[in-house]
A protein has these predicted regions:
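Conserved N-terminal phosphate-binding loop of PLP-dependent enzymes in the Aspartate aminotransferase
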Residues: 1-205
């Protein structure tokens, strides 16, 4: 009886034209706390696949506009997951060594700090000026797998503004930082420039 009742409320189904009430309730709850520029929810399996979906969205956005943009920019020492897209944008080769020859086209930049912010901005702007960058993916404020390497919101905000000026999709990987772990609902809220896409997973399930 319990299984039958559950099946009537929570269908195990791909959301391609289908949905169910628990998913609708969760989507509405998320929309109530996400930054105001977030308008859509896309459900995936886990943190790694949420990153893959975000990268595909960014690449398809430019494809649909007729722009030949296929490069992704990510931070050095970042970690975004174990699926191929997520590994491509991760910077820790200890996890990715055997697969690196098959990755997406990714350019990695240093994490900005007080000492290098100007040089990082110059490098970032130079890369974006080539007009082949589709997206910039980052872990806001802290790189968890890199031994909790922190960076300041003011420096990240400067990069996000530069990306916006070049029509680059900003992707915040908040799989680790989301849902109050940094003192706000989302680490992205410490910046004045909101990401175009936010990836969530941990603490959601």
């Amino acid at each position: 009886r319990a299984v039958s009742a559950q099946m009537k409320n929570l269908d195990h189904v791909v959301f391609t034209g289908f949905t169910h009430k628990p998913a609708t309730r969760l989507a509405k709850s998320l929309m109530n706390i996400l930054p105001q520029n977030q308008q859509k929810i896309f459900f995936s399996d886990n943190g790694s696949t949420s990153v893959d979906v975000a990268l595909k969205m960014a690449l398809q956005y430019h494809f649909n506009k007729g722009n030949k943009r296929n490069k992704i920019i990510a931070f050095q020492d970042g970690f975004h997951g174990d699926t191929f897209g997520a590994m491509s944008v991760s910077g820790l080769s200890i996890y990715n060594g055997p697969f690196e020859d098959y990755f997406l086209d990714v350019e990695r930049i240093p994490v900005p700090n007080e000492n290098n912010i100007e040089s990082v901005k110059m490098l970032f702007t130079k890369l974006l000026s080539e007009n082949n960058v589709a997206a910039f993916i980052y872990e806001p404020l802290v790189q968890g797998a890199a031994a909790m390497k922190m960076h300041k919101s003011i420096h990240l905000d400067e990069l996000l503004k530069i990306a916006n000026n070049h029509e680059v999709i900003n992707i915040a990987d908040e799989v680790m930082t989301g849902f109050g772990k940094t003192g706000k609902n989302f680490a992205s809220e410490f910046m004045s420039t909101m990401p175009d896409i936010i990836c969530l997973s941990k603490s959601l399930t």
